[in-house]
């Protein structure tokens, strides 16, 4: 073998980088990444925001617990979020406010006039909404670079173009064959491979959990008049769109979840067209042109909660995957939780029980 480590983390996106940063000063850690740069896939394509309602009430503790570190690192910019509904969707709006207000999120219901004051040129049929004033934009690149730098400072090794080719279970751990020809040993193998999480498990002889990737599309568009910087993140209570301002432009998404194989995701023209059509149903402000479009993969376990913990059938295989679209905003708390579980130490304030792999045990 070329080297031996206590822990090998598969994947150098936000999940793998944040976890490695927490582990590096307490174990000998290697992060392996198949691409030629970290964060090429989901992390590098995220239109991330920190909003406590995103992901549902069970994800909320991870988001809330992550807030202080994200603020301390200076990667949050106040934005506010406004979830809106048409005439006839008042009950959905009321249920949204009751659900998230009931778990401690600051929310307030708005009437038509209050919504229109925040969304210029709002069309008449949008009459009800819920404001989350605490929502912020996240500087994803800065956060990811912080974790990579912290991991490096803590002594973590990062090998690029070194995807996992094969994993053999041996007494006391694993013998790993990498795509670059190197072979390494480790005590614990951590699966932080995002859309490839089940594939990594399969290479290790571990039963996949059904973590499935779904494509999400975003388009950057120019509108007339120019989008105001003070515009909040605007979401549909029915889950059909969201949009937010970005340097005088707008980022639009049709909130698509198209099943996909793990891949270098690319946007489909139909999804870009849907995003524009749904935006123009909300605001009387035509899209002049599409300047950029991209897609990323969001990966979910069958119950749409992340998976953090040792595999129930193999105590040397650790799941750190299935973070869906909320992996960025929950990264600090998830890393603390994951490191605590891995090392048998304090995992912070979040209860790990809802996220354990044991819930899928057959």
Which stretches of residues belong to each language-model region?
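C-terminal catalytic lobe of FAD-dependent flavoproteins
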Residues: 281-362
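Short hydrophobic core segments
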Residues: 8-10, 184-196, 335
């Amino acid at each position: 073998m070329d080297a031996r480590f206590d822990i090998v983390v598969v994947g150098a996106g936000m999940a793998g980088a944040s976890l490695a940063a927490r582990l590096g000063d307490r174990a000998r850690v290697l992060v392996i990444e198949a691409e030629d740069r970290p964060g090429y896939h989901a992390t590098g394509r995220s239109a991330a925001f920190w909003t406590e309602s995103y992901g549902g009430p069970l994800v909320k503790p991870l988001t809330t617990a992550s807030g202080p570190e994200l603020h301390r690192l200076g990667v949050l910019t106040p934005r506010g979020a406004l979830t809106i509904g048409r005439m006839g969707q008042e009950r959905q709006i009321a249920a949204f406010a009751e659900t998230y207000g009931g778990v401690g999120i600051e929310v307030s219901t708005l009437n038509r006039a209050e919504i229109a004051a925040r969304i210029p040129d709002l069309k008449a049929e949008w009459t009800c909404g819920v404001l989350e004033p605490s929502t912020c934009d996240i500087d994803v690149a800065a956060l990811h670079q912080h974790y990579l730098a912290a991991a490096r400072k803590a002594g973590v090794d990062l090998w690029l173009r070194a995807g996992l080719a094969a994993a053999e279970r041996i007494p006391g751990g694993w013998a790993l064959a990498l795509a670059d020809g190197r072979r390494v040993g480790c005590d614990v193998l951590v699966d932080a491979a995002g859309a490839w999480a089940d594939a990594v498990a399969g290479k290790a002889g571990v039963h996949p959990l059904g973590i499935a990737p779904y494509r999400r599309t975003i388009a950057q568009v120019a509108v007339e008049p120019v989008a105001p910087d003070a515009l909040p993140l605007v979401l549909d209570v029915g889950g059909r769109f969201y949009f937010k301002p970005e340097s005088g432009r707008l980022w639009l998404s049709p909130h698509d979840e198209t099943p996909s194989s793990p891949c270098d995701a690319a946007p489909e023209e139909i999804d870009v067209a849907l995003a524009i059509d749904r935006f123009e149903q909300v605001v009387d402000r035509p899209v002049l042109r599409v300047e950029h479009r991209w897609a990323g993969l969001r990966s979910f376990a069958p119950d749409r909660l992340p998976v953090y913990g040792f595999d129930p059938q193999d105590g040397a295989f650790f799941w750190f995957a299935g973070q869906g679209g909320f992996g960025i905003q929950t990264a600090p708390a998830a890393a603390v939780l994951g490191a605590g579980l891995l090392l048998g130490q304090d995992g912070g304030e979040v209860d790990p029980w809802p996220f354990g792999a044991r819930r899928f045990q057959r």
